[in-house]
Amino acid sequence: MRCLPVFIILLLLIPSAASAAQPETKDDAALASFYDNAKRTLQRHWAKSLCCPEDAWCCSHDEGK
């Protein structure tokens, strides 16, 4: 009887695993690109926020990217 809940959970996970294995569509690729751009922008702003006002030169090396 202890295995019954585990078996039911595994049965519920099988359909979600099948959908995760499907190939990406054009929309998925565009969304991944959007998330990559957002992550890169947040990392750049995070790095700039770590600079002290007296060390402003540490932020200027990233401006050309």
Swiss-Prot record:
Residues 21-48 form a propeptide. Keywords: Amidation, Disulfide bond, Neurotoxin, Secreted, Signal, Toxin. The modification Glutamic acid 1-amide is found at residue 63. One of its GO terms (cellular component) is extracellular region. Pfam families: Chi-conotoxin. Belongs to the conotoxin T superfamily. This is Conotoxin TsMRCL-04.
